[in-house]
């Protein structure tokens, strides 16, 4: 994974809006890109800030040409309407609708009429312009949807096709639960799903808005990486605002990363139109794609995309549960049927790969459920709020010395018992959101409760003159919320037959699309190979990363007298010779590794120094640089008991004679800092014997912790670990510190950490992680699992207060587990934040392990 900052100003492409009041939708044509001055590499700018309007010339023979005509010539491509640059006869020649989009019995064998939208004449097959149902109505063939499922074991393409073409059929606002309507409403989509490869849902990126997610699908990047952090945004360096109704969105400087069509063209693979002007009917878009598929070999693109503004438009208007949603879904399905019938008519239905995919879901939302910041703040006129299903706050006035994000956060935190949003400084947002490392993301962020909106004040809520709300649905919420999930279906010769796969995140699709086209992906946030199980054959075979630093295995026994920790309790060990026995135990490897490192030793992927420390109940990789473990691993059986801690061990720490005193923490640092305490990575409560309990109080098991965070950590170790072990027939737990002071989602180097903890020998982690693994089949114990694994991971923010949980004054049982669920994470997120590599020694294939690493336990109900 490349550092996100590298994507901020590299390869670019414009993406265009389709919002109400703007006469365009997302669009790109393969040869549209022209090199801009001042850029060293990559596809430079598309379009200037001002449209040109020369309309001289004609579209005769040029409708939907793949190459954009440059000034002073007029244009006939799919986006000329958006830039008022079409030839004068574009509508007349290219947007024909006469006699509709289908053949009827009375049209079969008709005399060709060039005014018709599509043809039913005897020569239409040869000319590639038949209506998509021509062979069904006029030749007695069956509709594609009426044919039985067939397993396409190899692509059956006409001569001249170098690779199976890829068609991406993207639908806006398609909530995953819409698929439950089944074949009665969507027979064509249901057939794609049942005959091909599908997931119960696909997770969008946050925010669950259209622009960020469509561009993520195209690039494999998080919004903080590609720069499109919302449908509207302000860039403080540009001092400019990007929004749906303005022309600034046409400026190339907003768009980072390398989208699929540029990846294709840079590697010699032709790409067709990805986006369409909204005035072009869906049927015309399908017919155009089908006509492009009949082009000569040297002109024919290998990748195409169709985009539908539905069902998003209707979902906003009627809400996701409105009975009015049935017709828009039927219309989308009808278009899918036209595509598949058209492919069958061209004998390409066993050749082409089709991806049917959404950008986000839809939730039931109305004006009546709106939180107003004026009920919390007295100065709402001094702030700018990006409102709606999430809130982003900045000062209305630049260089406002009185603007204090922390003070605003304090005034918005836990002020009402029925508060429907939670304020965060962006660096404190759950790491799984990947929504902090971009200057366009404001310092203050409001996570809004599902089904609610946030606005500055009542006057900011737009209603109809009648006073009624003009919308019943919206999206943008936390991307783990089930209503925000969307659809994924893959169908064709390269996808598996009748296969259901686990849910995944849309950052992974870019790599899959590259694999389908035989392309090498540009750097992206996906994990290449994690979706290999979708495909019949895999062109990319991932390999495990090489270990950079191998550990030391301490052999020297330091003298007890060498240590002055300032908190030792060894003088309380009775009898005195027992101390020697306890220390000798520390050099006994025994079966520790087999018992506590069930999936192999984590690899360190950067240069450092660390030691492997064995104990009866756990194993650690101890950092000589950070003076704490990088990881600690232990296995807890279903039968494990939670025991109490003896009084004489509650406030002391033992020296570890295997580690030099100079590489050991000192308790005096904690005694001198009343704001800091310490905790343990292996929980003393789970020690298997009184002797083993002494190992848990070794200084090498100690980590710095704020007293407030210790409440979270102790409850997790004392109660939740045992709970999970009981529920899952045993678990393996790996925990450790995270350092992400610059909140870029990547491991901080030693030099970077020193910048933030100057003057301290013990760096304070920004987060702590925990990876909890068991057998997916709970009838098998964790340490004897021979089937698929199940994993739950957490990245817990290490903060000096628990104000994120408004009921943190209550018993931990009332709030800690909910806090942890909010900060659920993928193993892959933890790997990026620690530069560690987990699960290196298992009987599972490496792609299967990558699938496990990219899984997110959402703790949401079923879709």
From Swiss-Prot:
Organism: Homo sapiens (Human)
Regulation (activators, inhibitors): Inhibited by lysophosphatidic acid (LPA) and sphingosine-1-phosphate (S1P). Inhibited by EDTA and EGTA.
pH dependence: Optimum pH is 9.0 (isoform 1), 8.0 (isoform 3). Isoform 1 is less sensitive to pH. Isoform 1, isoform 2 and isoform 3 all retain some activity at pH 9.5.
Thermal profile of function: Isoform 1 and isoform 3 are active from 45 to 60 degrees Celsius.
Binding site for Zn(2+) 1: 172, 210, 359-360
Cysteine pairings via disulfide bonds: 59-76, 63-94, 74-87, 80-86, 103-120, 108-138, 118-131, 124-130, 149-195, 157-351, 367-469, 414-806, 567-667, 569-652, 775-785
Record field: catalytic activity: a 1-O-alkyl-sn-glycero-3-phosphoethanolamine + H2O = a 1-O-alkyl-sn-glycero-3-phosphate + ethanolamine + H(+); a 1-acyl-sn-glycero-3-phosphoethanolamine + H2O = a 1-acyl-sn-glycero-3-phosphate + ethanolamine + H(+); 1-(9Z-octadecenoyl)-sn-glycero-3-phosphoethanolamine + H2O = 1-(9Z-octadecenoyl)-sn-glycero-3-phosphate + ethanolamine + H(+); a 1-O-alkyl-sn-glycero-3-phosphocholine + H2O = a 1-O-alkyl-sn-glycero-3-phosphate + choline + H(+)
Propeptide, chain numbering: 28-35
Protein name per the record: Autotaxin
Residue ranges of every copy of the SMB domain listed in the record: 55-98, 99-143
Pfam families referenced in this protein's UniProt entry, alphabetically: Endonuclease_NS, Phosphodiest, Somatomedin_B
Keyword terms, alphabetized: Calcium, Chemotaxis, Cleavage on pair of basic residues, Disulfide bond, Glycoprotein, Hydrolase, Lipid degradation, Lipid metabolism, Metal-binding, Obesity, Repeat, Secreted, Signal, Zinc
